[in-house]
Structures are given as structure tokens and as C-alpha cells.
């Protein structure tokens, strides 16, 4: 497996970190295909949490697992989750890929654009139990330095827990609020939620925590094409990274801007 595009992405995001907190290079615009009776593609901004197993750091010897799968969280009560789940259900077992995605990010400090395309997957324990999420195959196809074996101490539930703990108490609480686009019936009081329960919390916090954890899911982005466009200095530089869907091997090509 080639790590060229992953290493380049990690380098660029590090170069674009803003100590003031104004610039968040991990925010990307994500576009997916329409479902059902919808006409238009859907687009939204998401906060990528790094790569499955390692987050935003380069693979280290003590990592349980390392991949080139990008991951972020979403609420299973959201339209986004329902759309992705419907598309991936129609993807199995083979054929067209209705769960296609493209994401795009702009890095203002270095004047660079990143585009990533491929297949998008929603993970919940229920989807995995119904074989509507390719749990093992997805990892086996994207493992880095693990000889094709999934470590026994790693699981998708452990990954969900890891991402959950990365969220702030306030952001965790947002998963217990009324679903997006539901009828507005006044502001809802939100209390920050801990990463785990001790049993000493107020009943209201415990109930909110259970709701939030139950609605907390992962979105996994399986990249097949990655494009880096550097606009400075002119005339710029555009590099394409493509993954062969049969051999799973990556190739890189520089093309004109």
C-alpha cells in the first residue's frame, strides 16, 4: 500500500494549523449522491477525525491498528446518516457504487486544495450485525503494516469509543438533542456529557448520555482518488493519486493545473 497521499495530507494539515483556532484544516465539504426521490446531491461541512486507528498522527510502533481510512462522527438520527445507510445497502454485494462521495478542503495558509473521492460507509453496531457494513473487508483492504491481519484487541466498537472520547462534553451532548430538521418546539437545555458514566450522575444526565451514545455513529471514507492542487507559486502543481479497484495498488501522476 502506498502511503504517499496519506503522508502528504498529514503534512499539509500540520502546516495549516492555526494557533488562534480560526483555521481548522480538518474541516472538509462532503458531497454525496441523492437518494430516493431527491434530485440534487447533498453537500455539508464535516470535521474529519483523522484515520481509523491512529487519528491524525503518523503510524507508530505502539499503534494497535493503522489504516488509510478517514473517519468522522454523525448522528444516526440525521438525514446524512439515513442517506449513507440507504446508499451502502444498495451497494452490496457488487456492481455500481451508489455510496460514492467526494470531499473537498481548502487550506488558506498554503493556498492548496484537496479533493478526495471514493466510497462512504456508515458504521453502527446494528448495521454490522445485519451485514450492511463491510466490517472486516474494509479493514483488511486498508491495513498498514499488519500483514493483512486485524489485531484481536481492535474492533469497530473500540474505534467508536475512541472517537467518542475525542469529542468535547458539549459536543457529546448534542447527540441527545432533537434531531436536525425536526419541528422546532423551543430551546432545549443541554448539559455537558462525560465520556463514560460512573453511576453517580443525575438521572437526567444518565438518560441523556444513553441517548447520545446510542445515536453516535461513525462515517468511514474509503478513498479511491486523491488530488492535491497547489496554486502557489504560479503556475501551480496538481498531483493525482489513484487506487486500482482490482489490485488495490496506488499510483501517482502529475498533470497540468
Swiss-Prot record:
Alphabetical GO biological process terms: pyridoxal phosphate biosynthetic process from pyridoxamine
Gene Ontology molecular function: FMN binding; pyridoxamine phosphate oxidase activity
InterPro entries documented for this protein: Pyridox_Oxase_Alr4036_FMN-bd (IPR024624), Split_barrel_FMN-bd (IPR012349)
Any GO CC annotation of this UniProt entry: cytosol
Pfam families, per database record: Pyridox_oxase_2
Family: To yeast YGR017w.
Protein name (record): Uncharacterized protein C725.03
Organism name: Schizosaccharomyces pombe (strain 972 / ATCC 24843)
